[in-house]
């Protein structure tokens, strides 16, 4: 398996709404990479896996960066759009912890953000939408975007230089 293309394929699946298949592709790469007995690799994603499942050439790959890009922008759905922050999660129910949370730490517009999705009903991708968003415990006004919400860059730029908690409550689509 050529890892770089497999990750890009997963990215495209997520981008076109095939969340279950995208998850399956990313999870297969991850499971193969962490199976040291078979892959004979230190943790990481190699350029490709041989027919025996052995990882080959860990230093000739952009797979890990594409994997992370896919996790941030597609799975967690955290990305920029014309300077504003868009939150459009595609997390599967099994990706939330026992309390129904999934958290990502990232940078956006020079601000350190802790994005915590709260899925109290343990809904699967496609079953939920963004209900409300809080920054540091305060409700904020968001613009609805297809499949998520948009937060104004200006609102984020007014925040002091610190880590800011974005609590994103997911609700069943109606």
Describe each model-derived feature in a short phrase.
Residues 8-174:
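Non-catalytic C-terminal accessory modules of carbohydrate-active enzymes
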